[in-house]
Amino acid sequence: MIQSINHICFSVANLEKAIEFYQNILQAKLLVKGRKLAYFDLNGLWIALNVEESIPRNEIQYSYTHIAFTVTNNEFDSLKEILIQNQVNILPGRERDDRDKRSIYFTDPDGHKFEFHTGTLQDRLQYYKEDKKYMTFY
């Protein structure tokens, strides 16, 4: 039986640039760095970076696939400012109802998508139950 997510691994083109992003933007703690890999601890989540220099990376922009991090509403604006100050690629977000809470989407240097989100699963389900009568809930 699956217990939890063990780790998340990202393919990166430039290890130094990626390390800078994960340390400075996501505030992950660098645990080990090799010639072609780096491991981080992000509040108990193991993030691995592995260098793959010659793979296509442009197609990733067409996918909604992303990893969302929970942040508080009080922290949201300061985290957004960190993204702006560090010239992180901020993506246009989708239209949101206030009940959907606050989000900002952005990418790392290799195009992997992330989101800072202030809502919870329960917030989202409650909103959908109130507004999306066509959905089936279990």
Swiss-Prot record:
This protein's name: Metallothiol transferase FosB
Q: Which cofactor does it need?
A: Mg(2+)
User: Could you tell me what this protein does?
Assistant: Metallothiol transferase which confers resistance to fosfomycin by catalyzing the addition of a thiol cofactor to fosfomycin. L-cysteine is probably the physiological thiol donor.
Q: EC top class, in one word?
A: transferase
Residues binding Mg(2+)? 7, 66, 115
Protein's GO biological process: response to antibiotic
A Gene Ontology CC term for this entry? cytoplasm
Query: Which InterPro entries is this protein grouped with?
Result: Fosfomycin_Res_Enzymes, Glyas_Bleomycin-R_OHBP_Dase, Glyas_Fos-R_dOase_dom, Metallothiol_Trafse_FosB, VOC
Task: Name the active site residues.
Answer: 115
Q: In which organism is this protein found? A: Bacillus cereus
- Which compartment or compartments is the protein found in? Cytoplasm
EC numbers? 2.5.1.-
Similarity annotation: Belongs to the fosfomycin resistance protein family. FosB subfamily.
Name of the gene: fosB
